[in-house]
Amino acid sequence: MHGGVTASTVQFSPTVPNMSPITDAVVLGGNGGLVFRWSGQKCCAVQVELNYMQRGWREANEEGAYARALHYIELPFLMHIYFGSPTVRGFVNLGPQIGYCVYDNSGIGTKQTSEVHQYNPIEKPFDWGIAGGLGFYVRSRKAGLYQLEVRYNYSLGTLFDNSLSAHFRNSNPMELSVNLAWLWEFKR
């Protein structure tokens, strides 16, 4: 099992004027889930996770602020490459991830109108993208593995319609997360 902190935003194209500074656009949230890893080779493994992830974005202007929270159930399928001693190992995780938005609040803050496209309910709750992470773990003889990972997820799917007649060409969520994990090893 693992849990951590997520910093997320959404890349809009055309850009949203109120999100110009990146610090105004980032929303902090939490994440947690289950990790399943199968090591069949000397230096690599397959890792599958089932995660609950909080995402969103924030805007600020002279009239006030707007924040949006999106909660996802995610399923990353990762290639896990590790190196180092049997006790302390570094690793790289890389692979695709899919997800589904299970909660979308309508926003907190300034007046919401349908004229501002990013304030509308999301149109595409299904998400897919690429995840990559770096980290290390320490193996304990009796208490399993303790792992620290920094991961970046970039969604290739969009939150809103991106057809030729749509307002946004892109509305891709992205997040950076820091996770601590505790894993148990089962021998064959």
What residues fall within each predicted segment?
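Residues that define the transmembrane beta-barrel architecture of outer-membrane proteins
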Residues: 24-30, 69-73, 88, 124-130, ...
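Predominantly the C-terminal beta-signal and adjacent terminal strand-loop region
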Residues: 49, 122-132, 136-188
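Extracellular loop and loop/strand-boundary signature of outer-membrane beta-barrel proteins
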Residues: 17-22, 60-66, 114-122, 163-170
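Short glycine/proline- and aromatic-enriched beta-strand/turn motifs that initiate or cap beta-hairpins
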Residues: 1-33, 183-188
